[in-house]
């Protein structure tokens, strides 16, 4: 069998991996084998953390809504129950922004649930 020279194909593949790992520390951005391993690991972390980011933001929003609700003498769960009972369908992201930046509107929403 004749020898196959795949010079530019291999170089292109290695170059692509090394470009993806630019900015990594030490050999992780210089040596192909370690760079390839770190690239695989980085992609795994990225996919895991996309789901984790959604979780973290939801926790942050709930904490902010709870702080706003406590100022009104309610717990988070009581407030959300009142919203559902009154048919107020505002998502947690917007409620958290209202509780943090526009407390007057947030307080009016809470007052509306008392009626």
UniProtKB/Swiss-Prot annotation:
One GO term of the biological process aspect: translation
What GO CC annotations are associated with the protein?
chloroplast; ribonucleoprotein complex; ribosome
Designated name of the protein: Large ribosomal subunit protein bL20c
Protein family (similarity comment): Belongs to the bacterial ribosomal protein bL20 family.
Gene this chain is encoded by: rpl20
Q: Please name every pair of cysteines joined by a disulfide bond in this record.
A: none
Q: Where in the cell is it found?
A: Plastid, Chloroplast
NCBIfam families given in the database record: rplT_bact
Question: Top-down, what is the taxonomic lineage of the species of origin?
Answer: Eukaryota, Viridiplantae, Streptophyta, Chlorokybophyceae, Chlorokybales
Keywords in UniProt for this one?
Answer: Chloroplast, Plastid, Ribonucleoprotein, Ribosomal protein, RNA-binding, rRNA-binding
From the UniProt annotation, give the residues forming the signal peptide.
none
Identify a single GO molecular function assigned to this protein: rRNA binding
Per its UniProt entry, which superkingdom is the organism in? Eukaryota
Entries under Gene3D superfamilies matching the protein:
6.10.160.10, Ribosomal protein L20
């Amino acid at each position: 069998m004749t020898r196959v020279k795949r010079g530019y194909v291999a170089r292109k593949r290695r170059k692509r991996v090394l470009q993806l790992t630019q900015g990594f520390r030490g050999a992780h951005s210089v040596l192909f084998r370690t760079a390839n391993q770190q690239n695989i690991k980085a992609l795994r972390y990225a996919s895991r953390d996309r789901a984790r980011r959604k979780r973290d933001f939801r926790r942050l929003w709930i904490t902010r809504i709870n702080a706003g609700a406590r100022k009104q003498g309610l717990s988070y769960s009581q407030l959300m129950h009142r919203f559902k009972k009154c048919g107020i369908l505002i998502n947690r992201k917007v409620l958290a922004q209202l509780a943090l930046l526009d407390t007057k509107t947030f307080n009016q929403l809470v007052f509306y649930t008392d009626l």
